[in-house]
Amino acid sequence: MQLNSTEISALIKQRIEKFNVASEARNEGTIVSVSDGIIRIHGLADVMQGEMIELPGGRFALALNLERDSVGAVVMGPYANLQEGMKVTGTGRILEVPVGPALLGRVVNTLGEPIDGKGPIETETFSPVEVIAPGVIERKSVDQPVQTGYKAVDSMIPIGRGQRELIIGDRQTGKTAMAIDAIINQKQSGIYSVYVAIGQKASTIANVVRKLEEHGALDNTIVVVASASEAAALQYLAPYSGCAMGEYFRDRGEDALIVYDDLSKQAVAYRQISLLLKRPPGREAFPGDVFYLHSRLLERASRVSENYVEKFTNGEVKGKTGSLTALPIIETQAGDVSAFVPTNVISITDGQIFLQTELFNAGIRPAVDPGISVSRVGGSAQTKIIKKLSGGIRTALAQYRELAAFAQFSSDLDEATKKQLDHGQKVTELMKQKQYAPMSVFEQAVVIFSAERGYLVDVELAKLADFEAALLSYAKGQSAELVSQIDETGAWNSEIEAQFVKLVEDFKATQTW
């Protein structure tokens, strides 16, 4: 069969018209150097700050330095198999993590992947780790309490829903213990909890998870882990991931509590990344934006208005406010609260609980220093009964500390000073509390009432703990109705006062401690 030139050209034309190449536009680059978890990439012209870059083997890096000819990115995970010349791809996506009720009771890593061996997490909701905090108009004032279960905290340094209260102190002063007890105390309160462990030993984290499980609080809690053995990038991002998980509840009209344990280690991880990216160092070798690192995180903890929740849920949730309460932890070196990161976080938060090594070693636990611990907004959120009864606690402790210092130099003290010293000693003893034993509103109220109304004058200091335990046991047996009323409402009036007086006087008459 012979084809003439016209037919040949017609066939070629037909082929050309039908020719189809499957093509896709990809933002691609080449790795030019790999060192200490930092990769430098040539290409990737359209990459965004904070964009996920896909690496060979299904891993990801985070674009942080955008330069004229190259991109500096930090690898999220192991980087031993990465080599120069490998091709990488921009995803066009900012880092997102899974959020929602399916994460409650689970232990996840920074990327929201389960690491507790309980199988995959079934959730279809994802949220970016970096979100702009709610604006001024979208917020509501803090006026509902978060009960930590600690007498010393709930009476002197009350915390409200939507507040940021810093827990600060040297190592081994009970910072984590206080935060864990606050989480355990929320199991009946309807507040969801998120515990973010940054740069801690895996054994310590395992112990925390076990304790939460033992006390029935894990089902209500999400644990986000970036342990000491993980990449600096994951330690730096862990608080933002945890915050996104907590915001899920806030934005839907629920209440959540988040603990960052601790932000000192996050700042160190960020310093490491910044120095490796050749960013100019500042004070204590931290980069210039270390304040912004913490402020943009802690500003996301807030109480949001009904309108915000309604708008966010497209009208599905009406008339409910949401809140995210933050308890950031900062570790100081030799009690130096004037270091760079501690002063930054103190200025960002709404108050601080300062735990002192001297008090801890003296057996006063929780080792709260009432002199420099403060809650700037919690007073308006305090339960009415605790607010009414605990007014003199801080004053009594402050006067006792001052008098105790003078009493060391003087032996002949007048009767009034002796009384004041005795009262201060007893209040100090009364503020002590065992770990994993949070107290209800009623329990705190009746103990503080006994101290404030002078019912402890004839009780020996050594027998005070027995007196407290016996009083609480007696109250639960004799006045169950009053106990449940106070725990539910937190109200205080002359009728309740009369019931309290009768309860304590009847108990003292039994002499059963």
UniProtKB/Swiss-Prot annotation:
Pfam families in UniProt: ATP-synt_ab, ATP-synt_ab_C, ATP-synt_ab_N
UniProt: ATP binding residues: G169, D170, R171, Q172, T173, G174, K175, T176
Compartments where located: Cell inner membrane
Class of this enzyme: translocase
InterPro entries linked to this entry: ATP_synth_asu-like_sf, ATP_synth_asu_C, ATP_synth_asu_C_sf, ATP_synth_F1_a_nt-bd_dom, ATP_synth_F1_asu, ATPase_a/bsu_AS, ATPase_F1/V1/A1_a/bsu_N, ATPase_F1/V1/A1_a/bsu_N_sf
Residues flagged as site, Required for activity: S373
EC number per UniProt: 7.1.2.2
Record membrane topology: Peripheral membrane protein
Catalysed reactions listed for this entry: ATP + H2O + 4 H(+)(in) = ADP + phosphate + 5 H(+)(out)
Quaternary assembly: F-type ATPases have 2 components, CF(1) - the catalytic core - and CF(0) - the membrane proton channel. CF(1) has five subunits: alpha(3), beta(3), gamma(1), delta(1), epsilon(1). CF(0) has three main subunits: a(1), b(2) and c(9-12). The alpha and beta chains form an alternating ring which encloses part of the gamma chain. CF(1) is attached to CF(0) by a central stalk formed by the gamma and epsilon chains, while a peripheral stalk is formed by the delta and b chains.
Purpose: Produces ATP from ADP in the presence of a proton gradient across the membrane. The alpha chain is a regulatory subunit.
Similarity annotation: Belongs to the ATPase alpha/beta chains family.
Protein name: ATP synthase subunit alpha 1
Source organism of this protein record: Photobacterium profundum (strain SS9)
Gene: atpA1
